[in-house]
């Protein structure tokens, strides 16, 4: 009986790898279409959109074409030979792509769940606000950091090989290969990034491909690193699997046989590593010598080249010393500085005064880049002098105040942990004067007249959430001494994202 139960569980676990029968279910495409409507944000009624674009007859025709398709390369091409029904032609290709995405997302979620359960608390899906306290706790104990930009110029066959690890049915792989080759222009460096950022029709599919690719990188790299560092506390002779582990390193890094020695393996004995990623940017914090950092860089380069058969440009991995240089990540300049502390220790009748030097993370907000962005959006000129936002003069007074309020609150909450908060209050001054000038331009008056008419409402309604945030969290004196990492941050700030792209272009050039 127990053997029969094990066979049933094994058969049930293998059923999730066979995905091709799901493409012949009509309700799957209805679910995919509902997800598309929820993400589109269109102002048209839902009934009108469904009656205009969605048709179960078109779905049945698409399913029939999938069954009878011989030349799979043209599957997304001529979906409907009737040139008078253009919407059905577009819906055919969209429905196949969205249905494929829904099926793969469900299977990927089941696979990632089992992977996370076996990783002792490792979770690659966390909120962005967890990154800032992690960096504040871990980076001061590191002396080197590796800034990695994950390559996103992916060949379709690499993605097919990734999906072959957990998809067992051949028809699904053939369908996926035909779609990937048909959409291979979307996997280039610029187009894939554009597809992820913009709300295009292939955004969901591109995001899924990107997440699958990064998940495959982390699912192989993170367990290997954890296993290596967990083995450092054991003796070489009492570790029976050490020989097998050396063979893995030899296979991945492609060491010559004469270079594999106990001395080279034990270089990382007393070091530790911390890994964090957001989007395509990853940080690996290390504590060790410069030689160890160079070895990790060498290992990572060979990991991508031999495991994914993908050329990894050397400029995509930069090794920086935190105490001497700055690293840009998530819109911050990251730097570790020494902080002296005076400790008084009393022993019996003697009082000792000891000076201790500790490392402290010093995150800095890019104030000049924020001013450049505000000048680009016509809130101020190049020199930082506030000007009126002429495109907002047609709005009501409440809408103008609310828009300026949201801009400042987003900036203040995101950069609340920076050390140069004085620069943020300079940004606040620019936004306040720009708001007053916009209202004055709308009413064809001056700033003094607007201030007299609105009174304190101009400065109480606008930027009011900042005072609520400060008063509910810390006092003013404590605010000057400590940083506040806001837990309401769900994504990177648009200004920080714009600045980070500028930094990436400078690195490439």
Curated annotation (Swiss-Prot):
Subcellular location field: Plastid, Chloroplast
Xref: InterPro entries: Domain_X, Maturase_MatK, Maturase_MatK_N
Chief location: plastid
Keywords: Chloroplast, mRNA processing, Plastid, RNA-binding, tRNA processing
Gene Ontology MF, one: RNA binding
A Pfam family the protein falls into: MatK_N
GO cellular component terms, A-Z: chloroplast
Example GO BP: mRNA processing
Family, per entry: Belongs to the intron maturase 2 family. MatK subfamily.
HAMAP family: MatK (MF_01390)
Alphabetical list of PANTHER family matching this protein: MATURASE K
Function noted in UniProt: Usually encoded in the trnK tRNA gene intron. Probably assists in splicing its own and other chloroplast group II introns.
Name this polypeptide is given: Maturase K
């Amino acid at each position: 009986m127990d053997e029969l139960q094990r066979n049933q569980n094994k058969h049930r676990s293998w059923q999730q790898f066979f995905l091709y029968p799901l493409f012949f279910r009509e309700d799957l495409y209805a679910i995919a279409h509902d997800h598309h409507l929820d993400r589109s944000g269109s102002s048209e009624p839902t009934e009108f959109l469904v009656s205009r674009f969605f048709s179960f007859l078109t779905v049945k025709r698409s399913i029939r074409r999938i069954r009878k398709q011989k030349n799979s390369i043209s599957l997304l091409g001529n979906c409907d030979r009737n040139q008078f029904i253009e919407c059905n032609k577009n819906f055919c290709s969209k429905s196949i792509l969205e249905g494929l995405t829904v099926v793969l997302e469900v299977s990927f979620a089941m696979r990632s769940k089992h992977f996370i359960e076996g990783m002792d608390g490792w979770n690659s899906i966390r909120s962005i606000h967890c990154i800032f306290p992690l960096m504040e706790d871990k980076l001061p104990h590191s002396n080197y950091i590796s800034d990695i930009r994950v390559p996103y110029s992916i060949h379709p066959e690499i993605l097919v090989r990734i999906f072959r690890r957990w998809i067992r049915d051949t028809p699904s792989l053939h369908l996926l290969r035909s779609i990937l080759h048909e959409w291979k222009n979307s996997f280039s460096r610029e187009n894939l990034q554009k597809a992820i950022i913009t709300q295009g029709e292939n955004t969901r599919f591109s995001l899924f491909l990107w997440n699958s690719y990064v998940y495959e990188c982390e699912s192989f790299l993170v367990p290997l690193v954890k296993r290596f560092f967990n083995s450092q506390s054991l003796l070489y002779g009492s570790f029976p699997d050490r020989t097998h582990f050396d063979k893995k390193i030899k296979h991945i890094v492609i060491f010559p046989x004469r270079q594999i020695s106990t001395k080279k393996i034990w270089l990382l004995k007393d070091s530790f590593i911390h890994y964090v990623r957001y989007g395509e940017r990853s940080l690996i914090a290390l504590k060790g010598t410069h030689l160890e950092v160079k070895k990790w860089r060498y290992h990572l380069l060979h990991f991508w080249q031999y495991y994914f058969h993908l050329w990894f440009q050397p400029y995509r991995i930069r090794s920086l010393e935190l105490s001497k240089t700055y690293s840009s990540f998530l819109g911050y300049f990251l730097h570790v500085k020494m902080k002296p502390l005076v400790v008084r220790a009393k022993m019996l009748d003697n009082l000792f005064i000891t000076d201790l030097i500790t490392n402290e993370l010093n995150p800095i907000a890019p104030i000049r880049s924020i001013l450049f962005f505000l000048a680009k959006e016509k809130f101020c000129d190049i020199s930082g002098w506030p000007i009126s936002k002429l495109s907002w003069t047609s709005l009501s007074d409440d809408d103008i105040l609310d828009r300026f309020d949201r801009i400042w609150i987003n900036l203040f909450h995101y950069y609340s942990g920076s050390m140069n908060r004085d620069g943020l209050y300079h940004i606040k001054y620019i936004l306040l004067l720009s708001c007053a000038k916009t209202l004055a331009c709308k009413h064809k008056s001056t700033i003094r007249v607007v201030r007299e008419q609105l009174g304190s409402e101009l400065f109480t309604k606008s930027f009011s959430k900042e005072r609520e945030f400060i008063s509910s969290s810390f006092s003013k004196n404590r605010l000057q001494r400590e940083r506040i990492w806001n837990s309401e941050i769900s994504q990177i700030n648009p200004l920080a994202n714009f600045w980070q792209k500028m930094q990436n272009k400078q690195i490439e050039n």
